[in-house]
Amino acid sequence: MTLKVCVCGGGNGAHTLSGLAASRDGVEVRVLTLFADEAERWTKALGADELTVIVNEKDGTQTEVKSRPKVITKDPQVAITGADVVILTVPAFAHEGYFQAMAPYVQDSALIVGLPSQAGFEFQCRDILGDKAAAVSMMSFETLPWACRIKEFGRKVEVLGTKSVLAASLIKGTAETVDPLSTLQKLHGAEPVFRLAKHFLEMLIMSYSFVHPAILYGRWGSWDGNPVSEAPLFYQGIDQATADMLTACSDECKAVGNAIMAACPGNDLSDVKDIYQWYLEYYHEDIQDDHDLYHAITTNKSYKGLVHPVKTVDGGVAPDFGNRYLTEDIPMGMIVFKGVAIAAGVPIPNNDKLITWAQEKIGKVYLVDGALTGKDVATTRCPQRYGFNTLNAILTGKKE
């Protein structure tokens, strides 16, 4: 039986996944890209040729994977109808358009995958798919599986590196779907090895969407407005106060997880780790001094040379607050977590402090006196936006 897979998107991740998945036996790949004329451009660029994925292996060798998607289209009816798996490889702000496009055509037995999903993926999917949402299964990945770059649009993409392990959460629907883990493993290959998280809220809480805003706040929170000579180091340039803020925000995440388990027995969020433990687990090979969080971040070799987003101004450079570190991580991250914290009845003053500072920098109003009543809440993915106002509604997807 042919496995029908729809890959949504036209960027680096969509190119990579389309090429890898289409190379597997018994897999039919349809690409759906809603952006402008991207589907037409991709179809024209590929012509009658095959899509090439250049994979840089861990042993230093290169492998070329050649394959061809069955169709590249802007028409959701063509791409979605009959698809066993629908995988979104687009930024979180674009998910809404794809959910709306697939809603009339997605089958009850579909597995809908966010690769990656970002916080609020399940809330948005449930809201837009309506009655169908109870039937479909939803899978959320924490990040993309690879570092990848398009080398020639529509024709060639390079995988610079592949993660060894990647966690996903699963909400099983009432309809029978393909086996989620083994199917995704088949499409990707031997690596990354996929593991299942215990709970979808574990993934939401452990997205640690406060990290980028906290580092920006640590460097620019008391900035005098004068240009600096060069972009400061981002991760490796943090101070102890920023590390302390990261720890405080992480402690609030754990408190929310514990409150949910206490209020709603049967929901296991015991794998929610503090951020220091997370660093030790994920970056143990790259950290040179692991005796505390500050040193774990500042001596992390994978962060070498990464600098703050800046823009050139007279006299030097100034912070670029229009960067995705705030424009995505606040509405698609911190505000979603805040919504869950409100439903759990847990105050999160350190997270609130970062949100209040960041929303002013990007010209938005989400949080007003600690409540999600700002005019821009409707542009976020917090559960309250969709009518999931209680823990029970958040956990079950049933609005009350």
UniProtKB/Swiss-Prot annotation:
Role noted for this protein: Catalyzes the reverse reaction of octopine dehydrogenation. Acts on L-arginine in preference to other substrates.
Transmembrane segments: none
Residues holding NAD(+): 148, 324
Protein residues bound to pyruvate: 118, 143, 212
Name of protein: Octopine dehydrogenase
EC number assigned by the record: 1.5.1.11
SUPFAM superfamilies in alphabetical order: 6-phosphogluconate dehydrogenase C-terminal domain-like, NAD(P)-binding Rossmann-fold domains
Keywords: NAD, Oxidoreductase
Keyword NAD among UniProt keywords: yes
Recorded GO MF terms: D-octopine dehydrogenase activity
Residue runs in coiled coils: none
Gene3D superfamilies, sorted: N-(1-d-carboxylethyl)-l-norvaline Dehydrogenase, domain 2, NAD(P)-binding Rossmann-like Domain
